[in-house]
Amino acid sequence: MPELPDITVYLEALERRIWGHELEKVQITSPFLLRTATPPVSSVEGRKVSNLRRLGKRICFGFEDELWLVIHLMIAGRLHWKAETRKSLSTRSSSKFKAQLALFHFDAGTLSLTEAGTQRRASLHLVQGEAGLSSLDRGGVELFTRQKPERKGGQPALGEFIDLTSFSRVLQSENHTLKRALTDPRLFSGIGNAYSDEILWHAQLSPVKLTQKLSDEETARLHAATRDTLIEWVERLRAETGEGFPEKVTAFRTDMATHGRYKEPCPRCGTSVQRIRYAANETNYCPGCQTAGKLLADRALSRLLREDWPKTVEELG
């Protein structure tokens, strides 16, 4: 699922292409995509884009008269840009593995929304004003104070990161595991499965440690790791994208430290990266750096193996 760094780079690429441009036509090709009936989606046609912002993991397109188109890509939704007119584009997806859900025809080109796989989770809402946006807001604190600040060095800065006191207050407002707290949209905005793994690796903290059991030093470490990890990945993705459009958005990157790196060596200590699987998600961590050599129980396998489930890295052989 695209998270804060991915959405940030999407927004910057969109700003260069559609800010101030007219949305001529919205073409919805999936009956499952649009989740609102009023205002009608046709009401944004003929209007110019006057704002772009992130709301959690959603991308918000602002138009005149305070109309907002809000896209949630979920796990497999992706955006694509073609500098072509709508007359020259087909409504068919170019890949049998991706379904085309919608086309947004601007006077400068066409933005398409696709979703891989068979499940249709991506969504589109059209809402009115800040009240409409608030209805989609899960309530998590924004980690960076400004979403569209002054540009610095040709790139928009992310703004000031949340201070340690505020971060700690939100983090410890409920007694959750660190993994759950970082990915809870009611607590923090924009962090998901991938970057939470990277943050916890940088902080050298166990994903199952409880938030209210953290020492002041551990909280400060997590605060710094969250800031540094998100900034680092925004900068990496900016460098990868350049002036183009982000077409390689993925949660699994070869230069990540732990996420998606099961059984590969930790880049810091060399210990094999391990995983905890639950439902459709997987948490990756380094036992050597994060859990003092202890293997965390994988719910499915530990039930199957019972006493044979290894407890430490050494028992893996």
PLM region descriptions:
Residues L69-H202, L210-K213, E217, L222:
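Phosphate/anion-contacting hairpin/loop surfaces
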Residues M1-S134, G288-L296, S302-G317:
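Acidic, proline/glycine-enriched N-terminal capping motif
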